[in-house]
Amino acid sequence: MQIFVKTLTGKTITLEVESSDTIDNVKAKIQDKEGIPPDQQRLIFAGKQLEDGRTLADYNIQKESTLHLVLRLRGGAKKRKKKTYTKPKKIKHKKKKVKLAVLQFYKVDDTGKVQRLRKECPNAECGAGTFMANHFDRHYCGKCGLTYVYNKAGGD
């Protein structure tokens, strides 16, 4: 029987086949006529891609049926290798939450009066409750940079 194969260019070629022929055989005949290797050929009939091991009868391809030939697409981009790191990831520092931590800034004296142990920053932009750091020779505000230096008694 005779079937037609329509190529991408619109050219139609005729092939002499039997209904018992496999799709592999049909692709080999197309290679003889067109020079396209069978591994690059995809044959479509009635919207379905024809698989190599099956016969024309499996797909109900009869005389004077038209198959559509499309070329197989090349694969996608080259697969990238997963990056391997030599050093382990640095563990992020976790701040410890200490309950009642504010108690270290205050002291209750013998009379029951609450005293501040640290000096509060007088600058308006820092706001109330901003304590200055106690250094051996000065008080320092980390927020605004205000510094008070202790007077040294008995200048040497």
Swiss-Prot record:
Covalent cross-link Glycyl lysine isopeptide (Lys-Gly) (interchain with G-Cter in ubiquitin) as placed by the record, residue numbers: 48
Family to which this protein belongs: In the N-terminal section; belongs to the ubiquitin family.
A GO biological process held by the record: protein ubiquitination
Cross-linked sites for Glycyl lysine isopeptide (Gly-Lys) (interchain with K-? in acceptor proteins): 76
GO cellular component: cytoplasm; nucleus; ribonucleoprotein complex; ribosome
Extra remark: Ubiquitin is generally synthesized as a polyubiquitin precursor with tandem head to tail repeats. Often, there are one to three additional amino acids after the last repeat, removed in the mature protein. Alternatively, ubiquitin extension protein is synthesized as a single copy of ubiquitin fused to a ribosomal protein (either eL40 or eS31) or to an ubiquitin-related protein (either RUB1 or RUB2). Following translation, extension protein is cleaved from ubiquitin.
Originating organism: Solanum lycopersicum (Tomato)
Protein name: Ubiquitin-ribosomal protein eS31 fusion protein
Positions of the Ubiquitin-like domain: 1-76
Entry-linked Pfam families: Ribosomal_S27 (PF01599), ubiquitin (PF00240)
Membrane-spanning parts: none
Alphabetical keyword list: Cytoplasm, Isopeptide bond, Metal-binding, Nucleus, Ribonucleoprotein, Ribosomal protein, Ubl conjugation, Zinc, Zinc-finger
